[in-house]
Amino acid sequence: MTFRPDVDLDPGRVRDVRGRRVRGGGLAVGGGVGTLIIVALILLSGGDLGDILGGLPAAPVEGPVGSQLVNECESGADANQRQDCRLVGAVQSLDVYWTDVFAASGEQLQKPGVTIFSDAVSTECGSATSAVGPFYCPLDQTIYLDLGFFNDLETRFGAEGGPFAEMYVVSHEYGHHIQNLLGLLDAGRDTGAEGGAVRTELQADCFAGLWGGDAVETGFLEPLTREQVAQALDAAAAIGDDRIQERMQGQVDPHAWTHGSAEQRQEWLINGLEGSSLADCDTFNADI
C-alpha cells in the first residue's frame, strides 16, 4: 500500500521509546516468537495475555526517548521509505477511518495510544520484552509494537512481507482497540476452531480489512493493488494457528486454536476488505 507522497504526517501521534531501558521484573518471554504464539501458549494454560501482563508490576523506564520520528517522519514520501514512518501514516489513516465510523453512529472515537519500542517496554498491563511482538493493552488502551516483528513475520513465519502486510498487523491491533471500546474484546476466551478466542481474533482481522478496503478515502493512501492485497493475505495465512502448530509441533490440533487457521484468517480479512460495515464482521454470530 503506497502513501500519497505529499500527505503530511504527525510523528507526535506515535510515542517512540526505542533506546530506552526497562529495569526490574515483568513479563520476560524468550524466543522472539511473537505475540501470536505467546497468546496461544497462555490460553492453553487457562489464561490470556492480559491476565499474565496484568499480574505483573510496571517496570521503571530509563534513558532518552527516541527522536527519529520527530526528525524524519514528515510526509507520505517518508512513509514510503521508512518502516517507522509507515507506522505513523497507517495509524493516522486508521484514526480517520474509525473516527468516521463512530461519527456515523453519533459516537466519538477515543483513539488508542501507539508506542514503538525495542527490547522491552513498560505498560499499564505490566512490562514485556520484544519477544511478545505487537500487542494491545486494554488497561492503558495502547498498541505496542516492536518493529523487529515485521522481520520475524518473514524469517520465522515465512510470510512474503511488504508494506500492506505490515499495516495489516497494525490495523489488526487497532481492531482490538475498537473491540475494547465496543465491549467485545472479552466476548469469548474459549479455545478451538469455533471458540470465542478465535472469533475475537477473526473479528480483528475483519476490522483490519474494513479499513484496508476504504483506506484510500482517508486521504493518506493510494488504491490497493492486487499484489498488496496478496501480501496481506499471505501474512494472515502465515500466522494462522494451523501453520504455527505445524511449524512448531509438527502436527495440527484445532482444539487448541486461539487465532484461527490460515484459511479462516484469510477469509475474514477478505470479508472486511469486501465489506462496508461492522455488521459484516459479526464473527460471534457467523459460521466461521
Task: Annotate each PLM feature.
Residues M1-E72:
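Long amphipathic alpha-helical segments used for membrane anchoring, targeting, substrate engagement
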Residues T2-V17, E194-P223:
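Post-HExxH zinc-binding segment in Zn-dependent metallohydrolases
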Residues P5, D242-I288:
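Pan-zinc metallopeptidase signature
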Residues A40, W98, L145, Y168-L181, ...:
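Active-site recognition of the HExxH zinc-binding catalytic motif
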Residues L53, A120-D146:
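Catalytic zinc-binding patch centered on the HExxH motif and its immediate surroundings
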Residues Q81, C85-Y97, V101-A103, E107, ...:
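Short helix/loop segments within enzyme catalytic domains
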Residues F149-Y168, G192-V198:
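Short pre-active-site segment immediately N-terminal to the catalytic Zn-binding motif
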Residues Y174-D190, L210-E217:
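Catalytic Zn2+-binding segment of zinc metalloproteases
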